[in-house]
Amino acid sequence: MPISCFKCASKCPARALEKIGKNMTVDEILNEVISDKIFYDTSGGGVTLSGGEVCMFPEWTGNLAAQLKANGINVLIETCGFFDYSKVSEYILPYVDTIFYDIKLFDSQKHKEYCGVYNDSVLSNFVTLHNNMKDFGFSLLPRVPLIPNITDTDDNLSSIAAFLSEENVSKVQLLPYNPTWYNKAEKIGTKPAIMLQELRSFPAKEQIEHAKSFFTDKNINVGGSI
């Protein structure tokens, strides 16, 4: 069973393992963020809460978001959509300005295969957020990562586009695949779980334009690093 508590790092005789990062309280994070508030005020920026999955810790995340908002700092969260909506609604949504919401795979079985869980709650949570975003006052942006032969297939993109169109979503962000992780995996002696040759290259412009067409055909505006 994999060890994820970092106890092995302190015992590693060759010091090959090192824990990166540190535990911080909400107050410690807030103090550090506030020290840079002048930059947020000047640029119109704010704080992005990402992960991991911040919605797995709704009370802690909500506490931080509430204090950020109380200090006039814009709050954005990134989520995979797999969370308990009732808790997120209670603790987080009142203090969020923007939500980036990843929709990777529309087919539930494939979502289970690649992401480890079925996507029923991912899709239903998106619909509920979209229906309630005006009441809470946040904006919601769905995002689709374009992973070669996994998420960028015609079937997947057309299904996601149809789903978003049915919910009257007006904008989506496409995230073109970045292959730089592949070489990093090899350098640390890890064999990538998926050995597709397509995963070694950046997508061609034609591939990205093809992906965009599924959404523009549904009158959905496409943004992102494209």
What is each stretch, according to the model?
Residues 162, 170, 185-214:
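A structural motif corresponding to the C-terminal lobe/cap of the Radical SAM core domain
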Residues 24:
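Active-site anion-handling motifs in enzyme catalytic cores
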Residues 15, 67-71, 218:
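Conserved dinucleotide-binding and phosphotransfer motif residues
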Residues 27-186:
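Conserved AdoMet/S-adenosylmethionine-binding subsite of the radical SAM
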Residues 217-226:
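Radical SAM enzyme core and accessory elements
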Residues 15-21:
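Iron-sulfur (Fe-S) cluster-binding segments and ferredoxin-like electron-carrier domains
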Residues 1-15, 53:
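Cysteine-centered iron-sulfur cluster-binding motifs in ferredoxin-type domains/subunits
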